[in-house]
């Protein structure tokens, strides 16, 4: 009977304690162990720090730019307010690195941890007795594993490659664009000039007697012509205009075109079939070269 009554009153007891706890004013101080619970500036509970913790170990790290502690032990700091600390020493015998947790309110090796709020462990030289002494502290997890000796390196290193690529791209983009534009312009000029030097002549229309003033040079192919020797001897191939009527296009090359033509004999209706090679005015040098060759034969 008694146990049943107590069992029925237990839920009521829990509800009453819940109601009482909810009515406690927020300004009433609560008993909390300050060593076990620390809050940040926003009022959030701060958890203990994760730091490299290898005490003192020999190292090959020099005090140039940055290096790693090579500590394989990661420890949870004993108190939430403790931060990560790294100490680099160099004396006549060896180089050592020390990685520990420590409270920034307490001096370490006689020096105040004035950089405890930093997220990176940037070394600062301290005046030690008979040795080179650097120390740093930081407040991010395992931040004392990567120790940095140059503030400039610490500032630029994370985005160093990105900055280099950006600067290089911005620097090279204008010259590259100009170079591409020059290449395209030169290519278009070459294509246009070649088309101008080798025009597509209309071969569908029969060509009439052409004069030298029309910028065309006409050469009579003596060795392939059936013209009579009397007519051929009476013609000066170099200075006289020939009574030629072009017939059909036989072939076309890079520098000239070859036509089948009719060589009129005086004013009569008689003619001889000849081959005529025609050079455009722009290919005067090629025409002169061939003329000199045939003149020497």
UniProtKB/Swiss-Prot annotation:
Main location: membrane
GO MF annotation terms: activin binding; activin receptor activity, type I; ATP binding; metal ion binding; transforming growth factor beta binding; transforming growth factor beta receptor activity; transforming growth factor beta receptor activity, type II; type I transforming growth factor beta receptor binding
Enzyme class (EC, first level): transferase
Signal peptide extent: 1-23
Topological domain ranges for the Extracellular compartment: 24-166
Binding residues for ATP: 250-258, 277
UniProt record, GO biological process: activin receptor signaling pathway; apoptotic process; cell differentiation; cellular response to growth factor stimulus; heart development; nervous system development
Location of the Protein kinase domain: 244-297
InterPro entries per UniProt: Kinase-like_dom_sf (IPR011009), Prot_kinase_dom (IPR000719), Protein_kinase_ATP_BS (IPR017441), Snake_toxin-like_sf (IPR045860), TGFB_receptor (IPR000333), Transforming_GF_b_rcpt_2_ecto (IPR015013)
Coiled-coil residue spans: none
Disulfide bond entries: 51-84, 54-71, 61-67, 77-101, 121-136, 138-143
EC number: 2.7.11.30
Family: Belongs to the protein kinase superfamily. TKL Ser/Thr protein kinase family. TGFB receptor subfamily.
Description of how the protein assembles with itself and partners: Homodimer. Heterohexamer; TGFB1, TGFB2 and TGFB3 homodimeric ligands assemble a functional receptor composed of two TGFBR1 and TGFBR2 heterodimers to form a ligand-receptor heterohexamer. The respective affinity of TGFRB1 and TGFRB2 for the ligands may modulate the kinetics of assembly of the receptor and may explain the different biological activities of TGFB1, TGFB2 and TGFB3. Component of a complex composed of TSC22D1 (via N-terminus), TGFBR1 and TGFBR2; the interaction between TSC22D1 and TGFBR1 is inhibited by SMAD7 and promoted by TGFB1. Interacts with DAXX. Interacts with DYNLT4.
Protein name: TGF-beta receptor type-2
């Amino acid at each position: 009977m008694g146990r049943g009554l107590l069992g029925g009153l237990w839920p009521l007891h829990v509800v009453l304690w819940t109601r009482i706890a909810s009515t406690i004013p927020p300004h009433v101080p609560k008993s909390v162990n300050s060593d076990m619970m620390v809050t940040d500036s926003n009022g959030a509970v701060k958890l203990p720090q994760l730091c490299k913790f290898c005490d003192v170990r020999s190292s090959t790290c020099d005090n140039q730019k940055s290096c790693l502690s090579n500590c394989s032990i990661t420890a949870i700091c004993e108190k939430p307010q403790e931060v990560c600390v790294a100490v680099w020493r160099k004396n006549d015998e060896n180089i050592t690195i020390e990685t520990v947790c420590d409270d920034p309110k307490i001096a370490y090796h006689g020096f105040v941890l004035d950089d405890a709020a930093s997220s990176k462990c940037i070394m600062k030289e301290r005046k030690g007795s008979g040795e080179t002494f650097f120390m740093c502290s930081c407040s991010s997890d395992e931040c004392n594993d990567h120790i940095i000796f140059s503030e400039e390196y610490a500032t630029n290193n994370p985005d160093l490659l990105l900055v280099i690529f950006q600067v290089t791209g911005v620097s090279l983009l204008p010259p590259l664009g100009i170079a591409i534009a020059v290449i395209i312009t030169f290519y278009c000029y070459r294509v246009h000039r070649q088309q101008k030097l080798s025009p597509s002549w209309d071969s569908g229309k029969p060509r009439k007697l052409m004069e030298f003033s029309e910028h065309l040079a006409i050469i009579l192919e003596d060795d392939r012509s059936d013209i009579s020797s009397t007519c051929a001897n009476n013609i000066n191939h170099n200075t006289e205009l020939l009574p030629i009527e072009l017939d059909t296009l036989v072939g076309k090359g890079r520098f000239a075109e070859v036509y089948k033509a009719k060589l009129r004999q005086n004013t009569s209706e008689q003619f001889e079939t000849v081959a005529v090679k025609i050079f455009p005015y722009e290919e005067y040098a090629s025409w002169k070269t061939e003329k000199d060759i045939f003149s020497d034969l």
